[in-house]
């Protein structure tokens, strides 16, 4: 019957198609478009007709059904049950062999009566293997989520502080090493029940053993679905370690990064919204120093540099060289140039080597002016595959050395946090006790970002006490040398105790705190190991809170909820343009619209007439100067990603970023200086070292726009910028892995600035030597000596303003003919009234501005202010004017300035305006 209806429907369809064909063939369209339109309309009409016919047929059936009685339908259903489902071919064959439903095959029905179950076998594990049974697939397995506690806010507990007398007493006992106990090395953890109950340890080990024979792939897959905090991942940093630091920083109330959280102003450095522009609110704060030990590839450091923002932090790194090295090229949240790596005397980064520890201590001391770092972070660990249960015993020396290094390099009052694993043995607990002696407060905590099924936790130490730390440091150094000696002898002996157990047990409060911590983490670890096992059995399970927890945690930790860009900034076309074109960076920050040719425009040379002005003005106070060491004019430097660009000879020249080591989005005015070294007697020569980059003015420092600040504040910011970029070692590593090489990049320093009232101080810093039958004038900046080729003057107020001197108040004020309504403005209001000149005012001279300036100089015979000018000190064979005349001639020489003439003009001005100098 069904086949017949199908045939009739097909005939009807063919009939309609034929009608359409006939209509089409008889119709003569005027054009192709008309033909297509007519066909479409006819086809639509036919479909509408078919739809109405089918709808009418369907409605008739529906009405017939609704006309019936519900009770009659029910009764009929009871009287006339539906027909049985016909047997399949397989069932008919089975019935022919005597099979009866619900029974098995065989003479006595002994065969199976249910279908063969789907396989629960995992991977290639042998049939019947215990590991296969423990994690066999079970699709009915359901995890009880009520056993977990999932929170966003974490509560940390600080251990009870030790009394001062107790600290001193313990330090006294450490001086003769009588507390150091040597015994046979240990390779079991099961019997360590002094600081955790036997039941908790046994249950944890049993839960761990389930996964010993499970493949890494299955374990990772189960963990990804089971860990409620797994999707937090690494956010926009290079790895998860960065988020651990963010997590710890927040829950410990920002003691790690030492952020000033008042009014949440610190968030202006790293806005949570991408549309908001970052602001360097810590520009005037001291530089923050930190060390990252055993922490390659560098997630801890990337977070800390990002959190501190701009150039407010300087990092030192120490980790194993090779595959576990820092991957600085993956730093995208900040610049790698604020981070300096060091690998110890043996150049291998082994933190357990006593020689390396001593060299690291000396290195950090040199890099921080002997003070040490504000924060040390340590994240050491190594593979213990197959021996996970005794990870604590295998890591004991690593524990010791990381904590020892903190005592070597952290400054007074500084902080420290370090990754630990289990702390069940007297050795580990003794170390923690000694940290309580060295630091004001100590805490043990496992953050959310540390996966709950492992034994990882962190010790956080606040407020180093040098008076006690120095004693403990020397003791732990002796312990480490003893461990090194036993290792080199391949002895089976070991240092088993750092201090007597009875001393630890006598501190009952400490014992209670350690036991409570161990019990809590052991039970929590066991719980999540069982959860992993449950999720491994049923792969359909996943933690439903992962998404919400990620969003809420990032918000609580004050970290933007965004992902790391694929391919870094090189995946963005706009960013690539900035990386390759200095004018893109220039246009981003400079408000002056100018062509590339105008960047090379120069201002008129310095003359004494620049300091001439109607009284009671004090024009000499309007200028600051720096000595120049290069024979040419200062150069504009723009750092734009992979390269830095120097403007020379009317065009930008590219310099490798690795050799200049200046972060992107930086615009500076620099003196490309050659260092001078002394030879025999009075002989001098140019150093063979790469040229030194002397910063003489700054516009943008790693995205921090300082161009509109007063000149002194710009230079102060530049000094901090240089300190953050400072290299303690002359050579740095370029590249990673087998491609790494040591290079000597250009060093950066900030030029010392002087006012004209400080001419005597400047002159006292000069040294005169005869060189090639001419006078060479040398000046010193820090550890460098340069030849003085010129002085560059910068006017610190805008062109339309003049500086006067108040006789009554004995302080300067500003006034302007163009702003007569403003009156006299005291120096305290200059920044508010935008009186200070900007970087662009004194560096970029547009053609129209230069023309206007030259006209003013001609009109006033040179007695007008100049935004910037250069006083050349170079000797010339065509004239006797040079360093000798400049320094020693008592008056202007042939109308050109000398030091004596300059001083005389300043003294005369002071006399007339009645300025009293202290």
From Swiss-Prot:
Residues that bind S-adenosyl-L-methionine: 298, 379
Where are the compositionally biased (Polar residues) regions? 19-30
Task: Region Disordered: list its residue ranges.
Answer: 1-56, 62-81
Basic and acidic residues biased stretches: 1-18, 43-56
Where would I find the G-patch domain in this sequence? 86-132
* Biased composition regions of type Acidic residues, renumbered to the chain: 68-80
Does the record's keyword annotation contain Transferase? yes
Which Pfam family, any one of them, does this sequence belong to? G-patch
Keyword tags: Methyltransferase, mRNA capping, mRNA processing, S-adenosyl-L-methionine, Transferase
- Spell out the reaction equation it catalyses: a 5'-end (N(7)-methyl 5'-triphosphoguanosine)-ribonucleoside in mRNA + S-adenosyl-L-methionine = a 5'-end (N(7)-methyl 5'-triphosphoguanosine)-(2'-O-methyl-ribonucleoside) in mRNA + S-adenosyl-L-homocysteine + H(+)
Output the PROSITE patterns linked to this UniProt entry.
G_PATCH, SAM_MT_RRMJ
Q: Per the database record, which ranges form the RrmJ-type SAM-dependent 2'-O-MTase domain?
A: 236-465
Listed under GO biological process in this entry are: 7-methylguanosine mRNA capping; methylation; mRNA processing
The reply to whether S-adenosyl-L-methionine figures as a keyword in the UniProt entry is: yes
| One GO MF term attached to the UniProt entry | nucleic acid binding
The entry's active site is 419
Function description? S-adenosyl-L-methionine-dependent methyltransferase that mediates mRNA cap1 2'-O-ribose methylation to the 5'-cap structure of mRNAs. Methylates the ribose of the first nucleotide of a m(7)GpppG-capped mRNA to produce m(7)GpppNmp (cap1). Cap1 modification is linked to higher levels of translation.
| Name of the molecule in the record | Cap-specific mRNA (nucleoside-2'-O-)-methyltransferase 1
Q: Which organism is it from?
A: Caenorhabditis elegans
Q: What is the lineage of its organism?
A: Eukaryota, Metazoa, Ecdysozoa, Nematoda, Chromadorea
């Amino acid at each position: 019957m069904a086949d017949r209806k199908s045939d009739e429907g097909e005939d009807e369809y063919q009939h309609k198609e034929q009608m359409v064909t006939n209509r089409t063939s008889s119709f003569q369209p005027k054009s192709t478009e008309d033909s297509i339109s007519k066909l479409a309309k006819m086809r639509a009409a036919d479909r509408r007709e078919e739809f109405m016919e089918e709808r009418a047929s369907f409605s008739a059936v529906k009405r017939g059904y609704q006309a019936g009685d519900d009770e009659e339908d029910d009764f009929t259903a009871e009287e006339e049950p539906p027909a049985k489902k016909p047997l399949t071919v397989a069932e008919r064959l089975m019935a022919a062999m005597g099979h009866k439903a619900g029974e098995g095959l065989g003479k006595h029905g002994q065969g199976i009566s249910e279908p063969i179950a789907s396989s629960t076998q995992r991977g290639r594990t042998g049939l019947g293997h215990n590991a296969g049974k423990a994690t066999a697939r079970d699709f009915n397995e359901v995890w009880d989520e009520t056993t977990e506690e999932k929170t966003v806010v974490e509560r940390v507990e600080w251990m009870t502080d030790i009394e001062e007398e107790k600290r001193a007493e313990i330090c006294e006992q450490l001086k003769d090493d009588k507390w150091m106990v040597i015994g046979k090395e240990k390779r079991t953890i099961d019997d360590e029940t002094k600081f955790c109950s036997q039941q908790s340890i046994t249950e944890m080990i049993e839960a761990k053993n389930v996964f010993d024979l499970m493949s890494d792939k299955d374990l990772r897959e189960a963990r990804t679905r089971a860990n409620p905090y797994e999707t937090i991942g690494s956010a926009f940093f290079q790895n998860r370690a960065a988020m651990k630091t963010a997590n710890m920083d927040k829950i410990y109330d920002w003691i790690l990064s030492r952020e000033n959280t008042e009014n949440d102003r610190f968030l202006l450095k790293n806005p949570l919204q991408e549309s908001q522009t970052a602001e360097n609110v810590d520009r005037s704060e001291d530089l923050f120093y930190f060390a990252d030990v055993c922490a390659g590839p560098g997630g801890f450091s990337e977070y800390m540099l990002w959190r501190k923002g701009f150039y407010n932090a300087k990092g030192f790194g120490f980790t194993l060289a090779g595959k576990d090295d820092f991957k600085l090229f993956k730093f995208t949240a900040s610049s790698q140039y604020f981070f300096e790596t060091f690998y110890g005397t043996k150049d291998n980064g082994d933190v357990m080597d006593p020689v390396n520890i001593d060299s690291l201590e000396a290195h950090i001391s040199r890099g921080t002016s002997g003070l040490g770092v504000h924060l040390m972070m340590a994240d050491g660990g190594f593979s213990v595959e197959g021996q996970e249960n005794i990870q604590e015993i295998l890591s004991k020396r690593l524990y010791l050395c990381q904590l020892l290094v903190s005592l070597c390099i952290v400054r007074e009052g500084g902080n420290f946090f370090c990754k630990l694993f289990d702390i069940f043995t007297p050795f580990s607990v003794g170390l923690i006790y000694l940290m309580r002696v060295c630091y004001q407060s100590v805490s043990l905590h496992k953050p959310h970002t540390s996966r709950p099924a492992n034994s990882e936790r962190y010790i956080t130490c606040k407020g180093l006490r040098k008076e006690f730390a120095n004693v403990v440091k020397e003791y732990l150094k002796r312990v480490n040398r003893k461990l090194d000696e036993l290792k080199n002898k391949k002895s089976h002996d070991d240092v088993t105790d750092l201090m007597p157990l009875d001393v630890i047990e006598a501190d009952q409060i400490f014992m209670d705190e350690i036991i409570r911590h161990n019990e809590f983490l052991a039970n929590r670890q066991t719980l999540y190991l069982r959860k992993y096992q449950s999720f491994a059995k049923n792969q359909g399970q996943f933690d439903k809170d992962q998404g919400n927890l990620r969003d809420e945690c990032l918000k609580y930790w004050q970290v933007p909820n965004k992902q790391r860009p694929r391919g870094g900034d090189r995946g963005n076309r706009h960013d690539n343009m900035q990386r390759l074109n200095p004018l893109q960076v220039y246009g981003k920050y400079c408000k002056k619209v100018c062509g590339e040719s105008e960047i090379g425009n120069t201002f008129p040379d310095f003359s004494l007439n620049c300091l001439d002005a109607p009284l009671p003005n004090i024009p000499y106070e309007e200028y600051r100067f720096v000595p120049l060491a290069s024979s040419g004019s200062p150069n504009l430097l723009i750092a734009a990603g992979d390269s830095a660009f120097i403007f020379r000879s009317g065009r930008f020249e590219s310099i490798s970023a690795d050799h200049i080591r200046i972060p992107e989005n930086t615009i500076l005015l620099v003196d490309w200086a050659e260092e001078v070294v002394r030879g025999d007697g009075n002989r001098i020569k140019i150093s063979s070292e790469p040229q030194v980059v002397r910063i003489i003015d700054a516009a943008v420092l790693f995205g921090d726009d300082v161009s509109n600040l007063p000149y002194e504040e710009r230079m102060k910011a530049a000094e901090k910028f240089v300190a953050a970029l400072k290299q303690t070692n002359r050579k740095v590593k370029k590249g990673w892995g087998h491609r790494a090489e040591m290079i000597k990049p250009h060093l950066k320093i900030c030029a010392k600035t002087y006012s004209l009232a400080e001419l005597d101080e400047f002159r006292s810093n000069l040294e005169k030597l005869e060189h090639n039958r001419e006078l060479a004038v040398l000046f010193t900046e820090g550890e460098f000596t340069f030849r003085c080729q010129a002085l560059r003057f910068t006017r610190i107020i805008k062109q339309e303003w003049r500086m006067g001197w108040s006789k009554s108040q004995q302080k300067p004020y500003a006034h302007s003919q163009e702003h007569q309504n403003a009156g006299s403005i005291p120096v305290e209001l200059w920044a508010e009234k935008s009186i200070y000149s900007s970087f662009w005012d004194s560096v970029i001279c547009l053609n129209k501005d230069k023309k206007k300036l030259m006209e003013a100089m001609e009109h006033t015979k040179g007695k007008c202010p100049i935004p910037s000018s250069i006083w050349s000190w170079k000797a010339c064979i065509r004239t006797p004017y040079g360093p000798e005349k400049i320094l020693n001639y008592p008056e202007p020489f042939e109308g050109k300035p000398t030091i004596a003439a300059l001083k005389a003009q300043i003294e005369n001005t002071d006399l007339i305006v009645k300025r009293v100098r202290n």
